[in-house]
C-alpha cells in the first residue's frame, strides 16, 4: 500500500527530518481523502466467506469513502484510489483519526508551516467529529468492538488503553491546532 497511515505514523520520523515538504504533501493528500465521498460499495474480504450474510452491514460491506472517515492508505499498485485496503472496514477503526491529527500537529511543530496546518484543518476537524460519533452516549471514549483498530487481527472489546490514549492525545492536538489557527 502507498503510505499506509498506521505504519506511516510510526515510520515517518525520518521523512519528516530529511524531507519535511514531502511529509506535508502526504498530510494534505490524506486530508483530501478524509474529506472525499465515494459511494461505490465494496465487500470487505474479512467476510468474503459469508456470501449469504444480510446486507447492508457495515462490517460486511460499505461505501469506499465517507467524509470524515480516516482511510488506511493512499492506494496500492493494484488500486490507485485512496483506501485500497479492503480486508476490514477501516471507517470503524478508532486509532486512525487521532494518528492523523497528531501527525498534522507534529508537522507544524517541526516546520512551523502554518499554511500546511491551514490546508489540513478541515480534515482534522472532520476526522475527529467522525470519530466522536462513535462515542456512545454516557461514555467518554470510543469503545472497541472487535477488530476495529490498526491491530486488525487482534480483537478487543470495550475501552482500549491504546485507542483511548490516542483519543485523548488527538483531542488535545485538535484543540492545539484550533488555538494556533485562531
Language-model-detected regions and their locations in the chain:
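Acidic, glycine-anchored loop motifs typical of Ca2+
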Residues: 139-143
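Aromatic-rich carbohydrate-recognition surfaces in CAZymes
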Residues: 2-138, 159-178
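Structural transition elements
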Residues: 154-157
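Short, conserved phosphate-binding/catalytic loop or strand-edge motifs used
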Residues: 144-151
Amino acid at each position: 500500500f502507498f503510505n499506509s497511515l498506521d505504519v506511516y505514523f510510526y515510520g515517518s520520523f525520518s521523512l519528516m527530518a530529511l524531507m519535511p515538504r514531502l511529509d506535508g504533501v502526504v498530510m494534505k493528500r490524506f486530508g483530501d481523502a478524509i474529506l472525499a465521498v465515494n459511494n461505490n460499495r465494496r465487500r470487505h474480504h474479512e467476510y468474503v466467506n459469508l456470501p449469504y450474510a444480510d446486507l447492508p452491514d457495515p462490517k460486511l460491506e460499505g461505501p469506499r469513502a465517507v467524509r470524515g472517515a480516516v482511510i488506511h492508505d493512499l492506494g496500492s499498485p493494484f488500486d490507485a484510489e485512496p483506501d485500497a485496503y479492503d480486508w476490514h472496514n477501516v471507517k470503524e477503526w478508532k486509532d486512525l483519526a487521532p494518528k492523523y491529527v497528531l501527525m498534522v500537529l507534529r508537522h507544524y511543530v517541526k516546520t512551523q508551516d502554518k499554511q500546511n496546518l491551514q490546508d489540513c484543518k478541515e480534515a482534522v476537524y472532520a476526522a475527529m467529529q467522525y470519530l466522536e460519533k462513535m462515542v456512545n452516549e454516557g461514555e467518554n471514549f470510543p469503545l472497541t468492538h472487535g477488530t476495529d483498530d490498526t491491530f486488525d487481527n487482534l480483537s478487543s472489546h470495550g475501552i482500549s488503553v491504546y485507542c483511548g490514549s490516542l483519543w485523548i492525545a488527538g483531542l488535545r492536538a485538535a484543540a492545539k491546532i484550533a488555538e494556533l489557527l485562531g
